[in-house]
Structure formats: structure tokens, C-alpha cells
Amino acid sequence: MIRNIIIIFFSFVLLACQEQSQNKIAIVIHGGAGTMKKENMTPELEESYLLKLEEAIRVGYEILKNGGSSQDAVEKTIHIMENSPLFNAGHGAVLTSDGSAELDASFMNGETLNAGAVAGVTNVKNPISAAIAVMEKSPYVLLSSKGAEEFASDVGLELVPNSYFITERRKTQLENIQNKNEVAFYDSYIKDSKYGTVGCVALDINGNISAGTSTGGRSNKKWGRLGDVPVIGAGTYADNECCGISATGWGEFFIRNVVSYDIAALVNYKNLNIKEASRIALNKVKDLGGDGGVIVLDKNGDVSMDFNTAGMYR
């Protein structure tokens, strides 16, 4: 059984040192963690994942290399993944019990500690941009559902029909789950259907850290279920004083443990390195029965990519 499973936590990291200022720039991304059956992870599909992740991180890296902000790098990097059918975010997101897509995203600016998030949106092409707009153009941190969609329209974000997000792969996945008469956390493509969530953390030449995360949530979800992604401190956190974090995993457990903030607090207040802090936070999730992973980037440009699942693909 185990031999028929491939564990994946697709993650990439790029680091560089600017010659003029010697300030380090860095960017790290993930495309989700989980367990994929061997028959579903063909060499061609694996190559597609890797190429898309490489494309995404190159976009963000070029922004940083040219002196751009970590915020811009995170947003544009996540756009690439949201626009791809490969990931559980934007186009290609998992479907709710009624066959529609409901999307969540969050963003945090480590310089100002400003943050924004949207939850349960159904017509915003790039939810990460909506999250940033909430941060920049509203007095709020989190907007949901119809209100978030109205706000996105008011600020001029691109809107699309819900059918844009729906792919045959996800329709088949939902049908398979519903035929088993279960609100499944696991599915035939990826063990945790939230895995596939995308995230990015970046450090720019000015020492500013930004973090963002985007997801379609959980396949066959009901009743407006929300996970950790739109919850600042659970799925996303950033603070220039310590680090930035983007998480992927069993959202209910990440909310209960406030995983992203917990990592930042352990670094900030106990002076732990990001590897130690990540391990402690994820072990707490595991102790409660949850699993998942995080990418963490600290103010020095050091990176940690940790998980408490059975394995990790890098």
C-alpha cells in the first residue's frame, strides 16, 4: 500500500545577494503537501507541477532582483499558480458539495503588520489580489462571500463566472467522493484535498517580508466551511522582526493551533530558529490529530520547509 503512494510537498526556494547593498533577497513557494497515489502521479504530471512552480518562482524572483517589493513578488507569484489548473487555488480549485468553487486567500505585510483576507468568494479570478485589496483599500482585515465579491467589483478586480474555476478533474474527484457518500477530507487525487493550496513568502532588498496563501479549501465542503487560509495567524503570517509563514494542511487543526503566528512567536520571543519553531508548531498539530506543512522565511533570508506528514517532495 505504502509503495503505491507518492508523498508530495512541492516547494521551491531562490536566494540571492544584491551586489550593491549586500542585502539578501529570497523567495520560497509551495504548491501544497499531501499524499498522491502513484497511478495518478505520472512522470508527465510531475513534470507539469515542477515546471509551473519554477515558472511561478521565477516571476517573483525577477521582481525582487530588480528591486521590487516582496508584496508585489508574492502577489504575482501566486497569480501564476492561481491561474493554473494544477493546484487547489483559483482555476482548478476543488469543488463544494453543490459543485461550485468557493475560494479563500490571505496576505500579510511584515513591515506594517497590515493584513487582508477574503473567504468564500466565487467570482474573483485572483483571490490573492482581493486579499491585498482588502488590506490596502478597506478598513477591514477579512471580507467574506457576497460582501467580498461586491468589494472586489468596486475596486476593479477581474471577475469571472464560477465555471472558470471548474475543471473536469475536480468534477470527477467530487463525483467519486459523493458516490462514497462522505464529506471527504481525502480524495482519489491527493490525500488531503486541501493540499494543493498555494503559498509564497518573500524577502525584498529593503528587508521587508511578505506572505500570502490561496486555496479552494476542501473537496465536497458544506455550509460555508472555511479553513486556516483566510485566518491571519493560522494560514499566513509575516513580521519583519522575525519571519514570514505560509501553511498548507488540515485547516481546522491549523486554526486551533494558530500555527503561523505560533512559529513567529517562538522565533520572536524564545529566539528559536525557524526550523526549531516550525517543528514545535507542527508537532502540536500532530498531537491533536492533524497534519500539514509550512514554508518559513526569516529576516536573514534563511528558509525552512517542514511537514508532519509521511514525507515531502522538494
What does each model-identified segment do?
Residues M1-N23:
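Bacterial Sec-dependent N-terminal signal peptides
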Residues Q20-R314:
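Alpha/propeptide regions of enzymes that mature by internal proteolysis
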